[in-house]
Amino acid sequence: MTRYKAIISYDGTLFSGFQRQSQARTVQEEIEKTLQKLTGGQGIQIHGAGITDAGVHAYGQVIHFDLEQKRDPEKLRFALDTQTPDDIDVISLEIAADDFHARYHKHFKTYEFLVDIGRPKNPMMRHYATHYPYPLDIAKMQAAIKDLVGTHDFTGFTAAGTSVKNKVRTITAATLTQDPKTGFLVFTFSGNGFLYKQVRNMVGTLLKIGNGRLPIEQIRLVLESKNRQLAGPTAAGNGLYLKEIIYEE
């Protein structure tokens, strides 16, 4: 068996998420179907570093899979890239160590979240940025977002129903900028892992702070209380991008 590691990007608009589901179109299923075709019917399972939800996009998702036969990496990348649907792109592909695991090898992820604050909104970007038409104090949000940096228990920012018991994560960087060309707000979060809907819940809380409906200290309050009810609403998935994954040596 030869293990392969690939970096892929995808437009999440028409996917029900990354992970295979019954009666739903997913990124995992489309890639596995293509690999099955390329290998003459072998059943191949891929493993992703991040499990993105419906409508969420990726610039730099990492996957791995095993093939019985050794293939030229660039030829395999080209075949996968050209035979998967147009909303999936295979950026790079290489042979990996036998013990490499896309999800469980220690890594840092970076997520980006785009918010269209235009009035009116840009209809061409409706699948790629979340629209927020209400007044916002950007400086307030830039001050509040700093409270997310560090090692915290993020229970108050995760969705109900998660099976993960340890909710302590480290965020190494959290920033908010405004794109000078589009005017969109760009929230960027880097860390050693993120809980289910954590990024979207953090963005939803920051937007409420920017709109004056929550105080600037609310981030600290949610972290200390671990109370989801004190956080803002979950921002829509269409503004979220899995930007980059970096593995430790």
Swiss-Prot record:
Q: What class of enzyme is it?
A: isomerase
GO:BP terms for this protein? tRNA pseudouridine synthesis
Provide the alphabetized UniProt keywords: Isomerase, tRNA processing
Q: Name one GO molecular function term.
A: tRNA pseudouridine(38-40) synthase activity
Q: Which residues form the active site?
A: D53 (nucleophile)
Please describe the quaternary structure of this protein. Answer: Homodimer.
Q: Per its record, how is this protein called by name?
A: tRNA pseudouridine synthase A
Species, as recorded? Streptococcus equi subsp. zooepidemicus (strain MGCS10565)
Phylogenetic lineage? Bacteria, Bacillati, Bacillota, Bacilli, Lactobacillales
